[in-house]
């Protein structure tokens, strides 16, 4: 498939033109014209680039790419090595950030709901969803379910929280700042990737369960599901590579 055609297909699927983002979405670095082997991953780190070379991939699709709004415009050290790897091997680098967080089927938030069997009821903010569990469960039962589905036990704050959880709000990645707005919807629990110092006090004083699973863990499934969709619909060769990241 032509590399610019692939960009157009994904932009249309993810409705990329509807979002104002802090990073360019789409084909960030042009490589070989014909896409034959795609690697997907969360972040375009050097380890993922090295894996792409190992598997003879000509294309990378990630959630966290390059050229962020507040990023230094100087190409030194780490960034120089990354770009050198991409350019010298004629690799296409694609990245979709917010469009891949919020897509109603493929997005990170939708994938969290799918994994945890949560019925989506609506959105609190564009990047924050809320829904209901199939059955009421204790906070510890919900934490154990998260561990089973994500292969990682979350940080769980539960002091002053209700015994049972049925109404849940969530936001992939760095969503801890939305906790107060989410609580206005009468939720029992809030799940996100990151946690801040003040989150402990906010969760306790608002009387909810708070679960932090890690930024990386909550944002693996969006780009993975995008790759699987490309494989099903266009018969492209796609593999997801998970570079370990505890954060």
From Swiss-Prot:
List of residues binding a divalent metal cation 2: 64, 215, 219
Residues noted as binding a divalent metal cation 1 in the record, renumbered to the chain: 63, 101, 219
GO cellular component, one term: cytoplasm
Record keywords, A-Z: Metal-binding
Xref: InterPro entries: DUF34/NIF3 (IPR002678), DUF34/NIF3_sf (IPR036069)
Zinc-finger as UniProt keyword: no
Keyword Metal-binding attached: yes
GO MF assignments: metal ion binding
Family label: Belongs to the GTP cyclohydrolase I type 2/NIF3 family.
Subunit-structure text: Homohexamer.
Protein name: GTP cyclohydrolase 1 type 2 homolog
Species of provenance: Buchnera aphidicola subsp. Acyrthosiphon pisum (strain APS) (Acyrthosiphon pisum symbiotic bacterium)
């Amino acid at each position: 498939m032509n590399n610019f055609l692939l960009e157009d297909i994904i932009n249309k699927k993810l409705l990329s033109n509807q979002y104002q983002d802090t990073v360019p979405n789409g084909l960030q670095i042009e490589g070989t014209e014909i896409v034959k082997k795609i690697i997907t991953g969360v972040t375009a780190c050097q380890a993922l680039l090295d894996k792409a070379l190992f598997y003879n991939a000509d294309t990378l699709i990630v959630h966290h790419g390059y050229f962020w709004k507040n990023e230094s415009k100087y190409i030194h050290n780490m960034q120089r090595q990354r770009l050198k790897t991409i350019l010298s091997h004629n690799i296409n680098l694609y990245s979709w950030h917010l469009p891949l967080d919020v897509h109603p089927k493929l997005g990170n938030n939708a994938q969290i709901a799918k994994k945890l069997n949560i019925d989506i009821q609506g959105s609190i903010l564009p990047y924050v969803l809320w829904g209901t569990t199939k059955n009421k469960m204790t906070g510890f039962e919900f934490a154990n379910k998260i561990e089973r589905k994500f292969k990682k036990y979350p940080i769980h704050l539960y002091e002053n929280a209700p015994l049972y959880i049925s109404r849940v709000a969530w936001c992939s990645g760095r969503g801890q700042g939305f906790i107060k707005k989410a609580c206005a919807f009468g939720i029992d629990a809030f799940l996100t990737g990151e946690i801040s110092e003040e989150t402990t006090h906010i969760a306790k004083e608002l009387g909810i369960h708070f679960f932090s699973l890690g930024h990386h863990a909550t944002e693996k499934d969006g780009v993975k599901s995008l790759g699987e969709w490309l494989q099903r619909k266009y018969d492209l060769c796609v593999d997801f590579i998970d570079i370990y990241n505890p954060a």
